[in-house]
């Protein structure tokens, strides 16, 4: 993506995790990339971002592309020692460690560009997929058997697994409505069915 700042088009730097480091590439010619690690806004006196990258740590990384006359664009990333990058999960939030752990366990994938929408709702497809990943069973490579769950979707295999396990049953019209938000009562029913099958009182 790019933004217009005082008539100048600035492209967003490319961020990636590589060998335990945060690598940031600045695609803008005649500009500098400066950063801070204390949460403050980078200035022209801040350190230049090293081409070798920064070691992962738990904290805030703010970086700014400085073009001519001091104009530029600032970006913020939240990092964890476990090697994860977040755009919208502050390290001082009450849920940071839980989301960081869920990502480490491959339960969460995010919505792209290191964003996770922590305040967003959870739909029925997301919940079943997270549950399937948490249980760790092999997932069938087949359609789920619902009229609105087609093959090849990111949640199809998890839906098929949950249906075969009789954890989900869908609606009378044969649909599952995967994009609909899941309610707490629906989550409790699915969890209860799973725990009964596993002979457990908790996951």
What kind of feature is each model-predicted range?
Residues 21-23, 32, 43, 50, ...:
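Residues in flexible loops and secondary-structure boundaries
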């Amino acid at each position: 993506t790019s933004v217009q700042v005082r008539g100048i088009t600035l492209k967003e730097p490319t961020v990636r995790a590589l060998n335990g480091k945060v690598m940031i590439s600045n695609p803008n010619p005649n500009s500098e990339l400066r950063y801070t690690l204390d949460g403050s806004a980078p200035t022209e006196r801040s350190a230049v971002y090293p081409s070798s990258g920064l070691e992962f740590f738990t904290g805030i990384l703010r970086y700014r592309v400085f073009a001519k006359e001091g104009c530029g664009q600032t970006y913020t990333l939240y990092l964890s020692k476990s090697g994860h990058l977040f755009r919208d999960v502050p390290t001082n939030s009450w849920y940071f460690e839980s989301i960081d752990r869920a990502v480490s366990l491959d339960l969460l994938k995010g919505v792209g560009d290191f964003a996770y929408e922590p305040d967003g709702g959870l739909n029925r497809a997301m919940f079943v997929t997270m549950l399937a990943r948490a249980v760790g069973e092999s997932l069938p490579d087949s359609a789920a058997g619902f009229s609105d769950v087609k093959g090849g979707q990111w949640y199809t295999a998890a839906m098929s697994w949950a249906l075969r396990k009789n954890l989900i049953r869908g609606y009378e019209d044969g649909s599952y409505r995967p994009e609909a938000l899941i309610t707490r009562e629906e989550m409790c029913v699915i969890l209860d069915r799973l725990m009964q099958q596993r002979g457990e009182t908790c996951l």
